[in-house]
Amino acid sequence: MQSFFRNILIAAALLAVPLAGTAQNAAAFLSVVPDARSAAMGGAGVALSADVFSALRNAAQLPFSEERFGAGYSYLPWMRDLTPRTALHTAAVYFKPDGKQAVSASFRYFSQYGSERTDEEGNVLGRLEPHDMAFDVGYSRTVAEGLSVALTARYVRSEPGTDDVAQTFAVDAGLFYRHAVAASHRVTFGFQAANVGGALDYGAGNRQLPWVLKAGAAAELGLSEAHGLTLTAETEYRLRPSELRGWSGSFGAEYRCFGILALRGG
């Protein structure tokens, strides 16, 4: 429980800046790292060990979770001094009916600071309260020793505050592999194709979702019974929108102590 609330607070602090940098594009909140762990590690998360936010970063990690059930919530304020009511809310849950498969669900709600609508003479016609949301359902399963795959279906809805409402569907596909190289050391590899699907149509032309391909690797080193170190690196290729197409990369490290404290950087 302490870890749960600590993740909420850290996520709020670390992710305010990334959200500010991407909120200009259609459904850009889908590109925001929702959890404190991978955000603190430079955004690298596709090859990390499983936790509840694996439902979003790579659902193929979930069959290897040590817990049968998990639930989490993160709150990410955006430019609080300028837009006090703008934030991204994320909730995720997963369940493992057995040791080989997992089902997951998540919900993201991005509320934006509203503004007044006026006519040419300055008369107030109403208030705009734009918001976006996405709801996911995923299924993951091990297909060989150390290897799992996942498929996630996503519904995306965007309401700019006018009568126009844009909505579409997309999917994520993930792959995860882990291999023990010693009694307390292992390596993991992850791949994810995210937000592959339709476009948002606001009535004045389509706007593409942020299609991305991610691949990464991680090394988990058990330094002792109470201490551990994880090193990870990840590369990402953005396919759409076409004007943002290109490569990016991230890397990070995590030091764990007694299972209750983690120091991360990236």
Residue ranges of model-derived segments:
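Subset of outer-membrane beta-barrel
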Residues: 24-266
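N-terminal signal peptide c-region/cleavage motif recognized by signal peptidases
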Residues: 17-18
